Amino acid sequence: MAKEKIEIVVANDDTRIEKVDQVLPPIALLEKYPASEHAAALVKQTRHEAHNIIHGKDDRLLVIIGPCSIHDPKAAIEYANRLKPLREKYKDSLEIIMRVYFEKPRTTVGWKGLINDPYLNDTYRLNDGLRIARKLLSDINDLGVPSAGEFLDMITPQYVADFMSWGAIGARTTESQVHRELASGLSCAVGFKNATNGGVKVALDAIGAAEAPHYFLSVTKFGHSAIVSTKGNEDCHIILRGGDKGPNFNAEDVAKVCADIEKSGRIPHVMIDFSHANSCKQFKKQMDVCQDVCNQIASGSKQIFGVMVESHLVEGRQDLVDGKAQTYGQSITDACIGWEDSEILLKQLSDAVIARRKVTSN
């Protein structure tokens, strides 16, 4: 009788699973690509700088800038090499962190990122994707450029989170309980985007939830299933990315959100996403959003502490042809501004911060 019951359980299990493959334990990649002393020190320092900006102890602007997603490590390294001197040039006014996104949430289906499908050919070599991602993060941080990423699941952070100086929870997952729990345990600052419908309450609720301790299921560095107990993350904040009803980067919208933040007892300031619904999904409009935000900052507003920008070597986007990108340094997901505009944008942001200092010092 007992044997019959076991057979019934097995017969009804995994009925829609095609196959299950083994994944490398995190420790295998952490040992293969360990963080150098230089990289570890950079991450620690950048996290500290981000903390100070978020908590109003540093008047510089936190700038998350880089490709919508990474599909070509070579182009990502070139981007990092170009960004490094600008990070140094504007260090007194901007804390620049490179956007290094390996995972893409999809509204329906599509390429889910370098970790999920590193060869862009639907082979889903996730072990290779994890290797490539960690090696790239190691290389970028060793260059002296800190990295930022989006977190989509409870396991991948064990492979890459030690290289992340800042993290994001996207608009589609901000309301998710498990992502709030994850954010509560991440060692870096985490931004929650407002909902795709433009609502900000879910993001504010998420911040409150992530500040608290949680227990959730994940894996250890050795790949064993585990119960994770977190301390809570005091470095969470909101990202305004616009919504179905339009942008929310203008001064009036920012003031409304800041009023809600202040009611919750937190510092009333926000990060602005220049892309997505704020640019009406027209990549060149990121420059218009930048100009508006710079005007707010230069006028003395302290309600904006950070910005996000989708930027690449070559402007626009491209579709894959036979599983290959035809244009080097151009996005295969959301369209991005090109390098020339990126340089202009960073200078404008720096000038705005300098102007704000003059206004507020009088």
What do these predicted ranges mean?
Residues D14-I54:
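N- or domain-start disorder-to-order transition segments that initiate the globular core
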Residues G66, I272, G338:
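Conserved, mostly hydrophobic/aromatic
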Residues R241-G243, N248, K256-M271:
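A contiguous, surface-oriented mixed alpha/beta subdomain in the mid-to-C-terminal portion of proteins
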Residues H312-R357:
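Internal helix-turn-beta structural module
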